């Protein structure tokens, strides 16, 4: 079964980012992927996806987010037909005290097995 989160995690790994659907216990620089909503109709999935970049400095977290955003304009994760970047903004994490940036994406994917 197709997973939009897994597709983004695999794509980010190819781009050189340590990515997961949850933050690791340790690490100073990583990326998380989370489906935050969206609708499904007639075997077409329209997920809203949040990609969060975490780093030691706000500048590096933003740099990572911008790099990922720019890469999305030239290649897409498997199964994703269309991506619109809906937002890019700082999103501090109070629990880890690490700087974090978030990309909010609206996507279109075909549901297939």
Q: Which residues fall in each region the model found?
A:
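Short, well-structured beta-strand/strand-turn elements
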Residues: 18-23
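Charged, amphipathic alpha-helical segments and their flanking helix caps
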Residues: 1-17, 28, 34-113
